[in-house]
Amino acid sequence: CEASRGLGDVYKRQIPELVKAAKENGVAVLAIINSHHMAAMWPETEKIAEEGLVAFACTSYKPAVAPAGAIKPLFGTNPISFAWPRKNNTPVVYDMATASMAMGEVQVAKREGHKVPLGTGLTKDGKDTTDPAEIADGGVLLPFGGYKGSGIAMMVELLAGALVGDNFSYETAAKDNNDGGPPSGGEFILAIFPDKLSDKDWDK
């Protein structure tokens, strides 16, 4: 789905088609490219799970996170969301950034004047800091869980960038003028119909 640099939320209107395709085929994927911003992903994975499907979504954006052991940004905060359907109950829904903290939370901490945990990010000189301003203003976030989080962030780059035909996070930096406009990113949304892949008792 081509977003033409619009907000990703608009193009999530394709979700009903994704649900239909997954129920017909067992598995379906929706790829959104050239989106300005995806917003939170849990509402869409929850909506898919409410239709009786397992859902996974991930998105990449502009570089803000250094790989484990590095000091320069390469990955986006690269959030992931997962939802599991439950018959006669609300879905189990999970949503998180693969960074140690979402950049929005760092910005809130900066605005409110409180510190962030050690390990959240580095200064522009690559030094550990608990000052959110030093992270937000030229510094860099770190992945959660060190090399493990770094590996998951790389997975998101491959699924929401290379696989769908969009840019890697680091490639968007050249288009970023920091005014809230470009760059753009991609999103990968997977839907699985468990009734086709398992017996009917998968929800025991």
Model-identified regions with their sequence ranges:
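Secondary-shell segments that build the walls of catalytic and ion/ligand-binding clefts
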Residues: 111-170, 175
